[in-house]
């Protein structure tokens, strides 16, 4: 089953925290773009880089903007508390935005956030079990 962590690119840039681990996944592209601009890879450069490769990523299409759009449909968010690619502050910002949207839609029971202790950027047995239980609850045929 596919998983993707929730994050906030904008939070990482505003707090100068965590963008290094995320850009490491795009290391060759990041370094090539920095060389083209004769710039160091720093927070300001990374913001411009994100705007070049995915316009809107740090605002219109970031976690805090996108998660609320899923309401009122069922959504389970599972993140590790030690994921260097998804700093906890950004995760919490995205989750808080989703919680507000689900509450406003009268669908708070359709949103769940599971924060796994001591988990990094990985799919644990606990996450897999929680997802299966969630799928059974929300995707099973109704009588």
What are these regions (language model features)?
Residues 55, 72-74:
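Proline-centered helix-kink/hinge sites
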Residues 6, 76, 83:
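Short loop/turn segments at secondary-structure transitions that flank enzyme active sites
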Residues 81-86, 120-122:
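Acidic catalytic loop of the alpha/beta-hydrolase fold
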Residues 2-66, 87, 91-95, 103-107:
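Mobile cap/lid helix-loop segments that gate and shape the active-site cleft of serine hydrolases
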Residues 50-52, 79-82:
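Short, flexible active-site loops
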Residues 1-4, 78, 116:
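Alpha/beta-hydrolase-fold catalytic nucleophile elbow
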Residues 96-143:
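C-terminal catalytic histidine-bearing segment of alpha/beta-hydrolase fold enzymes
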Residues 70, 77-79:
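Short beta-strand/loop motif that positions the catalytic acidic residue
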């Amino acid at each position: 089953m596919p998983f993707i962590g929730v994050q906030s690119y904008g939070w990482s840039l505003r707090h100068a925290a965590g963008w290094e681990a995320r850009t490491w996944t795009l290391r060759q592209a990041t370094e090539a773009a920095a060389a083209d601009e004769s710039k160091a890879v720093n927070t300001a450069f990374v913001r411009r880089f994100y705007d070049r490769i995915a316009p809107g990523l740090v605002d219109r299409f970031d976690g805090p903007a996108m998660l609320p759009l899923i309401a009122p449909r069922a959504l389970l968010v599972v993140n590790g508390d030690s994921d260097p690619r998804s700093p906890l502050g950004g995760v919490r910002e995205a989750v808080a935005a989703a919680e507000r949207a689900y509450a406003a839609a009268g669908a708070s029971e359709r949103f769940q956030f599971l924060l796994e202790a001591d988990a990094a950027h990985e799919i644990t047995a606990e996450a897999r079990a929680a997802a299966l239980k969630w799928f059974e609850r929300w995707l099973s045929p109704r009588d």
